[in-house]
């Protein structure tokens, strides 16, 4: 399915530290052996997309990390190792606003993605649902089953067999017949509902925090217990409920307030705190028995990241190995109907509408839903 055009419409970095709709962005022409080219049919917005300004901003670079569409061309490795072929309906999680690959991003009519971050979309899913199987699923898996060091368990094959958690990350897990409890702060966010589902599949007991209006949402995705994050006694209530023994907390929001809540909820002997953004060092310093860390989803691609510190880093081969196993795991979960996407607010206003969607996210007008735009 050759693409004769050389330019396209895309959301790109503007010259005034802003995001603009360009109608003359170049279509990526070079396809590497392990990549696929995709005609984009739907895109999903994330809070990170609103942060690609200032030092993260590259004029002309395409924005966006989540998409779904139809493969127009596949490299030989993408076909031989991943079974991806022209005409396949797929979703992907890539790094937008990438100064090293400025022509590649999700918010465009055409994009390119490495095969190891691409999933085939189920036949009974539309493109909007497909666009929801991206960033959150990769980031939460990396955070829980690598950085936090939780064993994935046999329910999450082949990850469980291929990539065991690094030794020492979680410390010695308690030998008990009761499920280990994990706190998910921001349990009604996109990454939150994803993390809750994965933890339940892996056999954990999940406590979620969110606003009271989203309690039912968190429960629908599997949370065993839900607490109101705005309650002044939230952390104390969780600590009492867990008998002062909670050891694991995933912070899907990552503000000083949510870090403080997680730290206060963790038990007397401390434990592991993992966030999705750099956390407050001042808060982290308040409890030496808690080991904090944070994750950067694009690291899973395995390539150098040229964003400003502390986000910039060399390519991580171990992250790519994890990602390859995790993609095979996610594909099985999708195919078997074991996971569902976050609730979606679908709009058919295309890339132009997505500009307004970024403003809605900045203004916190969207809660408990993922914004998806059809192209």
Curated annotation (Swiss-Prot):
Pfam families in alphabetical order: ADH_N, ADH_zinc_N
Keyword Nucleotide-binding: yes
Record: residues binding substrate: 135-142, 297-301
CDD domains: enoyl_reductase_like
EC number(s) on file: 1.-.-.-
GO molecular function terms listed in the Swiss-Prot or TrEMBL record: nucleotide binding; oxidoreductase activity, acting on NAD(P)H
Function: Trans-enoyl reductase; part of the gene cluster that mediates the biosynthesis of the tetramic acid Sch210972, a potential anti-HIV fungal natural product that contains a decalin core. The PKS module of cghG together with the enoylreductase cghC catalyze the formation of the polyketide unit which is then conjugated to 4-hydroxyl-4-methyl glutamate (HMG) by the condensation domain of the cghG NRPS module.
Designated name of the protein: Trans-enoyl reductase cghC
């Amino acid at each position: 399915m050759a693409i004769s055009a050389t330019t396209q419409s895309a959301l790109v970095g503007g010259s005034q530290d802003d995001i603009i709709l360009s109608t003359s962005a170049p279509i990526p022409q070079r396809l590497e052996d392990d990549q696929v080219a995709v005609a984009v049919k739907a895109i999903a917005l994330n809070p990170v997309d609103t942060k690609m300004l200032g030092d993260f901003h590259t004029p002309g670079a395409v924005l966006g990390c989540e998409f779904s569409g139809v493969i127009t061309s596949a490299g030989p490795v993408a076909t031989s190792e991943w079974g991806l072929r022209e005409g396949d309906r797929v979703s992907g999680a890539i790094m937008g606003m990438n100064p090293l690959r400025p022509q590649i991003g999700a918010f465009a009519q055409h994009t390119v993605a490495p095969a190891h971050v691409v999933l085939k979309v189920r036949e009974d899913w539309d493109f909007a649902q497909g666009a929801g199987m991206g960033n959150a699923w990769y980031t939460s898996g990396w955070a829980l089953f690598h950085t936090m060091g939780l064993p994935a368990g046999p329910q999450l094959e082949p990850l469980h067999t291929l990539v065991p958690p690094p030794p020492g990350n979680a410390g010695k897990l308690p030998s008990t017949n009761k499920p280990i409890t994990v706190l998910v702060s921001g349990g009604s966010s996109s990454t939150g509902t994803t993390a809750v589902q994965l933890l339940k599949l892996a056999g954990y007991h999940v406590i979620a925090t969110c606003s009271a209006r989203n309690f039912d949402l968190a429960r629908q995705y599997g949370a065993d217990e839900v607490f109101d994050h705005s309650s002044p006694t939230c952390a104390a209530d969780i600590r009492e409920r867990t008998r002062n023994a909670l050891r694991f907390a995933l912070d899907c929001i990552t503000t000083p307030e949510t870090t403080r809540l997680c730290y206060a909820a963790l038990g007397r002997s401390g434990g592991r705190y993992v966030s999705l953004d750099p956390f407050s060092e001042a808060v982290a310093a308040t409890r030496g028995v808690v080991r904090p860390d944070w994750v950067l989803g694009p690291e899973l691609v395995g390539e150098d990241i040229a964003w400003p510190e502390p986000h910039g880093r060399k390519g991580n081969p171990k992250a790519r190995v994890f990602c390859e196993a995790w993609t095979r795991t996610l594909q099985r979960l999708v195919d078997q109907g074991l996971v569902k996407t976050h609730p979606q607010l679908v709009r058919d206003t295309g890339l132009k509408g997505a500009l307004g969607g970024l403003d809605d996210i900045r203004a916190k007008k969207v809660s408990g839903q993922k914004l998806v735009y059809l192209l």
